[in-house]
Amino acid sequence: MKKLLAILLSVFIMVPSCGGEGVSKEDPDNPYIWGGGSNKDEPGSEGKTYYPKPDGAFRIMTYNVGAFHKYISVMNQNIDLVSKIIKEIEADVVGINELDSMNTRHNANQVALLAKELGGWQWHFGKAIDYQGGAYGNGVVVPKGVRIVDKYTVALPNPTSYESRSIAVVETDKYVLAASHLDHSTEDYIQIQIQAVNAWAQTRYAGCDKPVFYLGDMNSVPTSEAIKSLLTCWDVISSKENTVGTMPATRCIDYIFHYKKSAPVKVLGSHTISRTYCGDVSKASDHLPVYVDVVF
């Protein structure tokens, strides 16, 4: 126990700051309502979207992009498709998992290329591991014009021989968004990571006057001990529709959370994105993106 506490404390020597599963039936009393399609003249393919965005909503997206090489062999074509999906969905901020940065697999900063394709968005890359002469990790993209007050990376503790993990954090003047990709190897290692995630939030953002969101590929289903441990500090605000597996998707492992001790939000709706007008979302990655609409 003393060794674990020492590991957790070492993660947080940082500058202080801030301080319904498978839902498809329309139901006005259910916040995870299905978007039945729209022809409004907004961003997207010819202004169309299957997921209409409510007026005044802030739309958060999480997306494991699989290093932009799962099914489309040309990286730039894959990035182009993902950027079109983000535009069609009208996301206001996106957390991204499985990004390459200047390695021999992809000699490019992938999150920077995506941000450019989105029209000059701002970005942050958080390295998880050294990989093939470069790096591999998570990222966050936010529109140009958003005021970023801090961006940083939290290295999660790793007392094992398994892959190291991290959190990529962007703090703006209105909200905090943190993207992470947790391990799946052993329950003990997963719990060590989750204790560190919870301790990071408690240490840095307890009582924060703006909402704090944590999102990404948790590699755990909703009924797992891992998600139960996260729920001691966080609320799941995204749909629990399936996000990964041979299409149609068979498991939910990608989530968006809200930190209980930060400023409150109201959830308007959420979905896993299983179809888009701009292209075949099942070919963009082996994961489906997830969004949630909130107001705060």
Across the structure, where does each feature detected by a protein language model lie?
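Active-site-proximal beta-strand elements of phosphoester/diester hydrolases
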Residues: 57-70, 150-152, 169-183
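Active-site beta-strand/loop signature of hydrolases that rely on acidic residues for catalysis
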Residues: 59-65, 82-107, 141, 177-180, ...
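Active-site environment of divalent metal-dependent phosphoester hydrolases
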Residues: 67-70, 101-106, 132-133, 185-188, ...
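Hydrophobic core
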Residues: 9, 13-14
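Sec-dependent signal peptide recognition
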Residues: 2-7
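Metal-dependent phosphoester-hydrolase catalytic domains
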Residues: 30-49, 188, 202-213, 219-296
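N-terminal, active-site-proximal structural segment of metallo-dependent hydrolase catalytic domains
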Residues: 15-117, 130-134, 195, 286, ...
